[in-house]
Amino acid sequence: MEICYVQEVASSLVREFLSRKGLKKTSLTLEEELPRAPRSISTRNELRAALHLDRLYKENKLTEKPLKTLLEIMTKYFLEHSGKTKALNMRGEQNPAPPKGLATNLQQRHAGDLMMAVCDVSDDETGESSAVSDTSKTEIYRSQNDLQFNKSNHLKGPDRKQKQTEAGVTSTGVCSEGELMPPRVNIREHQERESWEMALGAKSSRSETQRPRSSRMVRGMMSGPTASSQEDSLKKRGPRRSAAANTPNPIKGEVLSEITGGMGEPSTIAPANTALKLGKEFAAKLLSTSENLRNVSLCSTNAVPKPNAFAAAETAADGKGATEASPYASNEHRRRSGFSNMDLNSASLAKKTLPFHRERNDKEDLKLDDVEDCLVTEEIRNIPTALPGNLKQIEGKPIDLAQAVEIKKILFGSSFCCFSDEWKIQSFTFNNNQPLRYGFIQKKGGPCGVLAAVQGCVLKNLLFGKDADLRVLQPSDSQRTSCLCKAIADILWRAGDNKEAVVALSCGRPQFSPAGRYKADGILESLILYKIRKYEDLMGFVQQHISQFELGPFGCTLLTLSVVLSRSVELVQKDFDVSTNCLIGAHSYCTQELVNLILSGRAVSNVFNDVVELDSGNGNITLLRGVAHRTDIGFLSLFEHYNVCQVGSYLKTPRFPIWVICSESHFSVLFCVRRELMSDWKMERRFDLYYYDGLANQQDEIRLTVDTAATYIEEQENDLTPPLEHCIRTKWKGAVIDWNGTEPIL
């Protein structure tokens, strides 16, 4: 289990909580202080699948008052399975009546006292990092009338007091080594309740004289009033650490036997063992997450380790650090001891509770975050020092008024124009219709040229990439998101002449005050520009912020701005045949220049090959710029059928059998799943092409069979020939096209 993966899943869980609760300011602060890691989980469905919460999610939906967030669902599940079914319900009631045996001890305390329950929860015990203060890692439970039980009351002698100091347990339930964090033990059986009563009866006199230890602050949580001052707290922290260093491996069974007053009956230890087993069960589920999500990732591993194998590997890796004198040595010993005691029954129970979903495998290379200096352990020190390059932090530069004016002029021809609503609501959102999961959904007309060009690049990675899954057209969420990341990175890198790229992201806050001849549109003013000079860094950065492109709301606009800035406004203007051209034309339609910029990296105005010189007759020569090289994604146009233009071979015969189709002022995609179509002439005799149009509300797959061996005879009186067929015949002259039962698109 990689700690960085657990931390990233946890941070994604927090982001989902903040988003569902509508805490926008907190979310923005979190994004600034804890940026998303590469390949971060950005969708709720993917996060739910990663945590195996599908069953719990469905059960929650059936309740009278369903919980809104996954974090609440997990919390409810864990509390219910830690013996708190009666303590917590959907309405959030948290104050159950205490057991009879403990009520007697509780009544002896002053009514005004505020009791603090402090359970030490270290990274070693939970398997993940917690956001805690610099002086302590504790989980604080504040209660006035809840069940209170002081573990220190049942420890006798100096050695036992030393163990009590190390464990850091002062009240409420048992918190023995290896447990996740069960704060209280809920005694269900009558025999167990009697055992606890006997234990309390024997130690009740010492319970009144025992002074609670000072509480420790958890970041973001206010502590209640305590009897000891802050200075007193600092004095007590020192002995705690020294005791932890000098007392290796306290034994769980021994501590439990002391708590129960020396009674060795199994029934008295059963509640703690049950809580321990449930804690391990939940930890095993978290441990199994990254092991279940490996196949699609760029970083693959060999096999899923069993709990005992995991413990053995950790022990071997920590062998060197165990010999060093450190205040954390005891914690490390407890961690290894806790994992070594984990049996296969816990793992199998976890699998039965939350089944695997192996068809959606995805392991993320994520960012290690929120590790305090005073909390560094051998587990953190053993992380390889060679971190992936995509974890590099990239400094952004806010856009200024002058840049915004230049961009608007190159986009619209005027700084008074703005992005239309069709552009503002459009992102690269995938279709969840099962036969068309690879395709984008277009909400309204306008940015169809950008969508079709990016769609072609996504299909290239999906069908012919290194991790192509046998040309399957029904990718998982993680697969299609990964293909979108690579498509965006390739487009921007190509526009930057394979030397650099600029990624424009929205921060949600204006970076300058509009003035003069400039009209604000709410998008350009909030941009942060990130210049990246390595492709690996670009890929990691796009993966880290893919949610802005995929979920939006300005995904399509941000990509357009990024590709223009990657090419630079000056070079885009030089690519035009006429300097007054623009990238977005009338009615917010994409121009040919914008489509060419995405496909070839140059905003040329024509689709023929290379450059054509026109002699105006007076010795003046006009240069018309076309596509300079063979592209990855091709282009076919209905205008060629009407003899308005001539598409060159660079676009007609691309490296991959994917074409952007321009027909009736609309852009869509045509592709073949067999790459041999571009290299084997025998393949061109009869082959299948697939057509996708994100705007047409397409529900089913459209497969066309093209037969070039037969001859198509056009009927002069028939005006109902589908425009798509005309586009196809600009490349395969006279081919017969069969729609295979699908109604032709007219």
Curated annotation (Swiss-Prot):
The active site is at C448, H666. GO terms for biological process: protein K48-linked deubiquitination; proteolysis. It catalyses: Thiol-dependent hydrolysis of ester, thioester, amide, peptide and isopeptide bonds formed by the C-terminal Gly of ubiquitin (a 76-residue protein attached to proteins as an intracellular targeting signal). Residues 123-179, 198-254, 319-342 are annotated as: Disordered. One of its GO terms (molecular function) is cysteine-type deubiquitinase activity. InterPro entries: MINDY-3/4_CD, MINY3/4. Residues 141-152, 165-174 have a biased composition (Polar residues). The keyword NADP does not apply. Keywords: Hydrolase, Protease, Thiol protease, Ubl conjugation pathway. It is an enzyme of class 3 (hydrolase). It comes from the Eukaryota. Belongs to the MINDY deubiquitinase family. FAM188 subfamily. Probable hydrolase that can remove 'Lys-48'-linked conjugated ubiquitin from proteins. This is Probable ubiquitin carboxyl-terminal hydrolase MINDY-4.
